[in-house]
Amino acid sequence: MQRKEEELKMKKFLSVFLTAALAVSMLAGCGSKNETVTAQVIDIDLTNEEYAFGVDKNQPELLEKTNEFIAKIKSDGTLDEICKKYFSDGEPEAVKSATLDTSKDQLVVATNAAFEPFEYTKGEDYYGIDMEIAKLLADELGKELVIENMDFDAVCLSVSQQKCDIAMAGLTINEEREEYVTFTDSYYSASQRLIVPSNVTTFDDCKTADDVAAKLAETKSSDQIGVQQGTTGQYYVEGSEDWDFPGLPAKCVTYKSGSLAVQDMLNGNIQYVIIDAAPAAAITDAINAVQ
């Protein structure tokens, strides 16, 4: 009888021990999983580009005042605050356009509102870094703001034809566009960065953009790289003669935002993400904070 009681006690002990061991194993497994679902930015610029506004060549005074305004919002922190609304947790502000009326003193801005976060629409309202700057510039000049939304290819042309005063459309400075407009001083330095899962070591030894590009060139057609739709990252992955990007073997997957792309990467649906450096840092910090 005593032996049976001892055997029962031993069985209970073993049962409790195995249950505890299993629980510890599961917790350890969860911890390991969490380590692999964070995101890291490879701190190497894949591209370098400068954004500026394109002013009517026949309005040198507007060019001068716009350059003064750019210097002002850079120095007093206004530009940084605007950017934070779109790259961090700030609240973007709606910008409204007046109706074009040649009898009024208006600032007529040409844009292509399909380039979030620089310019985009929700309903009849405009949003984006460029659009908020446009509103402040119009206020600074004491003018009423009119926004003319058009195809991207027509933006600089409309200014050269004096249908609009200034082009504000995430414009990279280049010689071809300088035939149509006079560029202001740069207000935004853009570069593309690569985001990878934190357990990926493929790029650990990379020191330059060429090093990263060489690794990306080894991707397969079955691999997928996420980008925010319409951005330089998309051209980098797909290839573009205008941008002198050869393209990558991997398939380009577009998303409405960089956040959606990074989350899809962490879910295992794509391999990497390529987006602008500033949003790359903000997005990974925000997503990793809740992992």
Predicted regions and their residues:
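C-terminal motif of bacterial Sec signal peptides marking the signal peptidase cleavage site
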Residues: S25-G29
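Immediate post-signal peptide segment of exported/extracytoplasmic ligand-binding proteins
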Residues: N34-T38, D89-Y126, A209-Q224
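A ligand-binding cleft/hinge motif common to bilobed small-molecule-binding domains
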Residues: N34-T47, A154-L157, G170-Y180, Y235-G239, ...
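Periplasmic-binding protein-like
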Residues: V37-L63, T102, A113, Y188-V196, ...
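Acidic, polar ligand-binding/catalytic clefts
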Residues: V37-T47, K135, E144-A214
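Extended ligand-binding regions for polar small-molecule ligands
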Residues: D45-E91, M131-E140, P197-A214, T219-K220, ...
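Extracytoplasmic small-molecule ligand-binding "clamshell" domains
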Residues: Y51, E61-D89, D101-L171, T254
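Ligand-binding cleft/hinge of the Venus flytrap
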Residues: T121, A134-K143, A213-S221, Q228-T254, ...
